[in-house]
Swiss-Prot record:
ATPase which is responsible for recognizing, binding, unfolding and translocation of substrate proteins into the archaeal 20S proteasome core particle. Is essential for opening the gate of the 20S proteasome via an interaction with its C-terminus, thereby allowing substrate entry and access to the site of proteolysis. Thus, the C-termini of the proteasomal ATPase function like a 'key in a lock' to induce gate opening and therefore regulate proteolysis. Homohexamer. The hexameric complex has a two-ring architecture resembling a top hat that caps the 20S proteasome core at one or both ends. Upon ATP-binding, the C-terminus of PAN interacts with the alpha-rings of the proteasome core by binding to the intersubunit pockets. NCBIfam families: PRK03992.1, PrtsmActNtasePan2. Belongs to the AAA ATPase family. Signal peptide: none annotated. This is Proteasome-activating nucleotidase 2. It comes from Halobacterium salinarum (strain ATCC 700922 / JCM 11081 / NRC-1). Pfam families: AAA, AAA_lid_3, Prot_ATP_ID_OB_C. Keywords: ATP-binding, Chaperone, Coiled coil, Cytoplasm, Nucleotide-binding, Proteasome. Residues 35-75 form a coiled coil. Gene3D superfamilies: 1.10.8.60, Nucleic acid-binding proteins (2.40.50.140), P-loop containing nucleotide triphosphate hydrolases (3.40.50.300). Consists of three main regions, an N-terminal coiled-coil domain that may assist in substrate recognition, an interdomain involved in PAN hexamerization, and a C-terminal ATPase domain of the AAA type. It is found in: Cytoplasm. PROSITE patterns: AAA.
Amino acid sequence: MSRSPSLPDRPTLDVDPESTPAERLNALQDHYVDIVAVNGELQAQLDDVEARREELREEVNRLQRENETLKTASLYLATVEDLPEDGSAVIKQHGNNQEVLTELSPRLADTLEVGDRVAINDSFSVQRVLDDETDARAQAMEVDESPSVTYADIGGLDDQLREVREAVEDPLVNPEKFDAVGVEPPSGVLLHGPPGTGKTMLAKAVANQTDASFIKMAGSELVRKFIGEGSRLVRDLFELAEQKDPAIIFIDEIDAVAAKRTDSKTSGDAEVQRTMMQLLSEMDGFDERGDIRIIAATNRFDMLDSAILRPGRFDRLIEVPNPNPDARERILEIHAGEMNVADSVDFSDLAADTAEFSGAQLASLATEAGMFAIRDDRDEVHRQDFDDAYEKLVAEGDTESSGPRYPSYIQ
């Protein structure tokens, strides 16, 4: 039987019978050295084989787990709607909203609660309880525990800032003022105006000043495909705010779910209206939620349903227009505050030349001016850089909806 070619050759001892004892001793010593060397090679190969065996064992275990996963039937998501006292449960399957009465195992009967999210099999038996649904849906929400925007970062919105502080900051920081006067603070604040005028910055700055968590959600995220999903997300939004209070809820693009109702009978429009009804319901009970305030923003104030604007919901309507020349000068000074700007740059002249620019566009103007300076390998921003940036933004505005061409459509 031949040996593996990967094994080292076995050393052999050839001793001449006619050799002297000293020569025999030297031969034995050389043979011993050869044996030790071969043993080292064999030990190294053994270590490699054992390492490879361990890798193969891990691969086998992984494949076995994958095989078990492939053979395991998928589970469906459902919500517990009711828990009768006979050990059963009424569950509603997600997607088709089918309600089923199913028996619970003794292990789950004592721990399950109404509203829990569960996994069920094809026979509608509850297999396990899932994590809090609010956590699973938090990906649709932007939660900022401590916004970095301050009042100093906002320019040209002194009147709007004062109104927002009165309606949001004072009820959280100085509630005794309202108790002393005997009035209730506004239930909600609606910011309306063209895009890029600083509506989100206003909300973040107030959250920073009050040390409140900032929970932002776009209204379009509340528009869901399946029946009941949007309403459930609205409930999750307010439940998350309760967990993180003091908190400020900011709903951007609220017109996506609060547009004027029509006679349309399509399922999509009906679902949007159900979502709006859930939002109104949550706001009607808002005064019992403690240190939670709500702010919404829209670019299309003219599209909002009258129900969302009635007293007790959004009590304070604040228009955030494009900045005037003085406000534009202040905004430019803020955004260029950290830039190395040449002394020859006059922000008042720039403000006069940027009529109808929004705050966001002025921020882009400062950034683009800095980019032109970098392009010319300079560490100082000149007036010509701002002029080049202006021309660039205007040119982009001719082909995109983001240029300095916003109409004043807020009536």
